[in-house]
């Protein structure tokens, strides 16, 4: 039970590629629980914040999110999860983010 790596372990939710979830960066707040999000596939989508997330998780411009595009309208989608700055930096450091949305990359 005594593991030295426990201090450095961070558990981060990743998009479920089988269900079509992708990474995105919030570009603009549109109002009425709507956001303009630049997704990893290069498409800018109009995404909505579901009711269960509205009050619990506040989303701002520049946040890294998981988006699930709608099946019947590909230019729209739902926000599934928002990463904290620490989680986003961790994903960037470990090269888990696609180049197109890796705005957290620290130049060395």
From Swiss-Prot:
Keyword Membrane: no
Residue runs in coiled coils: none
PANTHER family assigned to the protein according to its UniProt record, in alphabetical order: EIF-1A
Taxonomic classification: Archaea, Methanobacteriati, Thermoplasmatota, Thermoplasmata, Thermoplasmatales
Protein name (Swiss-Prot/TrEMBL): Translation initiation factor 1A
Gene behind this protein: eif1a
Span of domain S1-like: 10-84
Organism listed in the record: Picrophilus torridus (strain ATCC 700027 / DSM 9790 / JCM 10055 / NBRC 100828 / KAW 2/3)
MF terms in GO: RNA binding; translation initiation factor activity
UniProt-listed InterPro entries: NA-bd_OB-fold, RNA-binding_domain_S1_IF1, TIF_eIF-1A, TIF_eIF-1A_CS
One Pfam family per UniProt: eIF-1a
UniProt keyword Nucleotidyltransferase, yes or no: no
Family from the record: Belongs to the eIF-1A family.
Keywords: Initiation factor, Protein biosynthesis
PROSITE patterns: IF1A (PS01262), S1_IF1_TYPE (PS50832)
The protein's role, per its UniProt record: Seems to be required for maximal rate of protein biosynthesis. Enhances ribosome dissociation into subunits and stabilizes the binding of the initiator Met-tRNA(I) to 40 S ribosomal subunits.
Family matches, as NCBIfam families: eIF-1A, PRK04012.1-3, PRK04012.1-5
């Amino acid at each position: 039970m005594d593991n030295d790596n426990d201090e450095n372990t961070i558990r981060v939710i990743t998009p479920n590629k089988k269900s079509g979830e992708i990474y995105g960066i919030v570009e603009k707040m549109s109002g009425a629980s709507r956001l303009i999000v630049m997704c990893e596939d290069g498409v800018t989508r109009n995404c909505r914040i579901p009711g269960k997330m509205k009050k619990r998780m506040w989303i701002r411009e520049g946040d890294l999110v998981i988006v699930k595009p709608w099946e019947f309208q590909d230019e729209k989608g739902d926000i599934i999860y928002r990463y904290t700055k620490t989680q986003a930096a961790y994903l960037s450091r470990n090269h888990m983010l696609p180049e197109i949305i890796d705005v957290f990359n620290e130049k060395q």
